[in-house]
Every structure is written in structure tokens, then in C-alpha cells.
Amino acid sequence: MGADNELSEFEKQRLANIAERDALLKKLSLDAQSSGLFPPKSARSSPGGQTKPKKKPPPKKVKKEDEHPVPRRMSSRLRGLAADSEVAKRKADEQYEAAQQAERAKRVRKSDAFSFSEMLVSGQKLSGDSLIGVDVVTKGVAMPYQRTFGDEDIKKTTDKELKALREEMSGLRLWEAWEPNRIKLTPERIYTMTFHPSEAKPLIFAGDKMGNLGVLDASQEKPTSAVKQEDDEEDAEDDDPDPVLTTLKPHTRTISSLHIHPSKPTHLYSASYDSSIRELDLEKTTSVEKYAPESTSDDIPISGIDMAPDDPNTLYWTTLDGAFGRYDTRASRRSAVATWQLSEKKIGGFSLFPTHPHFFATASLDRTMRLWDIRKLSHDDPVPVGEHVSRLSVSHAAFNSAGQIATSSYDDTLKIYDFGSKGIAAWEPGYTLSDAEMKPDTIVRHNCQTGRWVTILRPQWQANPQSSIQRFCIGNMNRFVDVYSSSGDQLAQLGGDGITAVPAVAVFHCSTNWIAGGTASGKICLWM
């Protein structure tokens, strides 16, 4: 009995401790709820007299009526195709081939004659009546807007004739009607440009990467609106219109070269990577193919085109395969086309000697500038009059009327070769020059590291300068256009506000001091 009584007392004490503990926990829970630490829990009875939290039901998902099932990838097994199925392979090959054929079709040249409406991309209709009428640059580093030639250089000039020309060329100013960033002449990167020979007004043509041809009449004046109403924001754009431009598409691939013969000012010749040379009649606004390989499947991209000043019927060209061609447009195609393989690598540029067009110069990826005489040119083993090898590839070789050649090269130099002083006009067929005689007379340091997105820099002479000093222009990676004399003296560095890209494609008007520069965005700068 004593043991039972002790056990009973112990049991009573244990139960009392449990009750005290529960009371304390309940009090702490109430205090926590009153202070907002956590919300009260709904309790339910349990067999032990303790409470358990009630489990919350999962939220109901509301189905959206307009929700479409997401497409899932399906394996070949689910589609009923065996592993490495010939059917799957054939289907993939067919899809790939169809995509390739569609891409090739876009790039195949079109041999048809085009009317204006068939070529027009944007702009107004062309009217025939309106159409006639030495710097040192750190190698490979472009420093936008940093000049390397300016007024101080002009002041230090001691030669009176040179100083006068420097002042004249440096006095050219940007066309004021529109800023350059608003004159978008072509949809894509400009590769080549030329002026119409007319001195009545500046008429500019530009060819781009995708075969588009842009035309700008820079004699147009910016229209002035009538009295403008205050707070009239809707008509703001109408009061400040862009210049009137015309964009045509005569080619399917890059237009690499443009040429207007002085005796045929109404005809523009264009050469392209689509292997064709076309003639655009500016009066009739029609385009016809003048030369192309016999088969449209022949891919022979043309890199340059030129014509002799005294012969408006013969076309000369070079290709990216290293060939040189000649074609008299008056004769039948097969009998009149003559080609020579002059290089194993790309010929990037060439030009004829204007006064003696049987001489011509080529610039090649094989690092050479070569001088040729077409009177003594073998088809089997063509031998040049002479050649000069540069450290890196030569981009272009431009002849002037004085017998001088200007080249640009990836070794960051402009080289000037004076063959006029060596008597080129009197050379007989078969005349050759030694390596020493082929060395350049002048070398000018010039940054030619254009990279992937800027068109290659090429020098271009003024065909008929108004003074005895020959001059050429070339783009500057610091967003200028540089002008040099044939002796390598810098005449000007043209820039201005609103030039937001490198005017890499720079061209002179043949006789007037007008210079245009084209950028990778299809916009142009014009100095007059």
C-alpha cells in the first residue's frame, strides 16, 4: 500500500508538472499572437487531448480560356521514326538544300534589261533634263576627330603656290542644306562613288554592298515652310524634310565600281560582284547588261572597271580571281572578250594611264603593285613592265594624267610612283623596269586599318585639276577626308559637325573642287 501511495503521489506530481508546462506554453503563444509575430492557428482535438494544426487545402488553379498549349519537342521515337532514319535525314537535307537554293537565287545576277520602275527601291523618278545640265598616324589606331593637319601647317608653308592651294582646299565646307547623318544615300554600306562630270551642279552616285545604287542631286535647296503655328508638333517633321534621293537596284550583289565616260555623260557603267557590268541610261532611266560570263552559274566577281578617255566603247575590268579583261561592246561577245590571268590572288583595284591607256596598273592581295603594257601582254605568260612588292597587301593603284600612280596598302602607307618623269609616254612595247626603278618616289604614313565593317581606303585623283598641282583624296580613319599632292604634301583635312562615321569612300569631281565621302551606314558627306 505504501508503494502504491508513493506511486500515486509521484503520478500526481507528474501530471501537475505537465499542466503547468501546458499553461506556460499557452501563455507564450497568446503573447506572441498579441504582438503580431504569427497568426493564430485553428486547433482540432486529438486522442491525446493535444491540438494539431489544420492542413490548408491547395489553391485552386484557374484555367485561362485563351491559353494555348506550349508546343513541345518530340523525339523521333514519338513521331514514329526509327533511330538514324533515312527519312529524317532526307527531310533535313531537303530543307537545308531549299534554304541554300533560295539564298543563291537572291545572289544570281539578272541579265534582263530593267526599266526604272523595275529597279526603283525608293525616291523620285530621275529626270534627264535635271541630270545633264605628310601626316603621321599611329598604326591601326583610329582617334575620332583628332586632326593631323590644320591651320598651323598652312601658315608654315613657304611655297606660295602650295600655300594658295592648301588655303583653297582647306576652305571647302560641308554642304549646309543637310547634316551628313541625314543624307542616307544607300540602304547598306557604300563601296564605291562617283560624280557626274557636269560642272553645273553636283550629282553624286553611290553603290552599296547589296547592289543598290543611290543618286543625289546636291543642287537642291532645303524647302522653307510657311508661317509655322506654335506648338504644332504634328507638322514638325513636314517642316524639316530629308533631302530628295533616288535608290535603284540594278545588281544583286555588291557594286564595286562606277564609271561615267566623259563623251557619254548620260550613261553610267556599274561593275558588281554578281559578275556583270551594266549600263544605266540616265535619260531613258533604263539599265542593260553590257558584259557578263556566258553562264549565270559562273561566279566571277568584278572588282574594278575603267575606260580609256578616247574610247567610249571598250570596257576594261579586273576580278577577285586575279584576272584582267577587255571587251569592245560594238562587237559580238565571244569574239571581242579578251582576258589575262595576271595574279593568283585578288586584284583589289586597277586603273588605266589616261593619256596612254595601253599602260595600266594593278594592286593585288599578293602585296604587289604591277605596271603592265597591253601591247605586249601574253595570254599564256603575262610579264609586267615592272612590279613593286609591299610588306602587306596593296588595296588600290590609281593612275593620273601625269603618269603618276598612288597606292594604298595595309602596311599603313600611301605610295606615289612617278613614271611620268621616267618617260613613260615614250616607252616602246616590251620596255621593262628594274626593281630599283619601280621603287616609290614618295611614301606617306597613313592609317589604312579599316577592319571588317569599314570599306577599304582607296586613293582617287582629280582627273582634270585646275592648276599644275596634281591632287588626290582618301578617307581618314579619324573621320576626315585627306587631300594630298602628287609630291606627298598634304593639302587639306576635311571634316565638320555631324560626321558620325568614317567617310571611307572618298571621290573628287573630275574638274571642280567638290569632294564626297561615303560611310558604312550609307550616308555621305559633301564638301564644296
Swiss-Prot record:
GO MF, one annotated term: DNA binding
WD repeats mapped onto the chain: 185-226, 250-290, 297-337, 342-382, 389-428, 451-494, 497-528
Disordered: region residues: 32-98, 217-243
Biased composition (Acidic residues): 230-242
Protein's recorded name: DNA damage-binding protein cmr1
Cited Gene3D superfamilies: YVTN repeat-like/Quinoprotein amine dehydrogenase (2.130.10.10)
Keywords: DNA damage, DNA-binding, Repeat, WD repeat
UniProt similarity note: Belongs to the WD repeat DDB2/WDR76 family.
Function: DNA-binding protein that binds to both single- and double-stranded DNA. Binds preferentially to UV-damaged DNA. May be involved in DNA-metabolic processes.
GO biological process terms held by the UniProt record: DNA damage response; regulation of DNA damage checkpoint
Organism: Aspergillus fumigatus (strain CBS 144.89 / FGSC A1163 / CEA10) (Neosartorya fumigata)
GO CC annotations, alphabetized: chromatin; cytoplasm; nuclear periphery
Compositionally biased intervals (Basic residues): 52-62
PROSITE patterns: WD_REPEATS_2, WD_REPEATS_REGION
